[in-house]
């Protein structure tokens, strides 16, 4: 499998707990798709744990893993958000938000202690989650004349794309979705069908 059209994420919310010198770290791993979802979840958990000393987090979005952020929420710089993000990266995850809530136990942990604790808490949440691999899919839209229906359907049957849309008349229309790495072969086969022409649209990418 190629790396460019697959990515790993989690299926459902998962929690983990880590305790160090009476400080309690509650980690919540949440599947997200957009920055708006991230903001909504942060608002919910900041209200839920209003009495906590710190509510730190990190997130990663998109199959290319280019949209990310780490937040220390008042902890010394680089001691909370960065180790949380480090766990996301080491597990090669995306479309994920990890929030770690800290209840201070009265004993300071120091910079290195905080890094270890936030890293461990995030790791606990990830360990409790179900990780799945998904594919990045692309669409193709085309028209062809009805007499060539059998040729098209033979290709569809053999290449097994998802049929999103189809209409049959003298001029038939069809929209298919298939994993990105398999699109070149599908398109090349369709190009050989007499009368078939592709309808170019603004490119869209779908994370299945």
Task: Please annotate each region the language model reported.
Residues 163-167, 192-208:
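Conserved short beta-strand edge segments in small beta-sheet-based binding/regulatory domains
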Residues 176, 182-185:
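Terminal, non-globular segments
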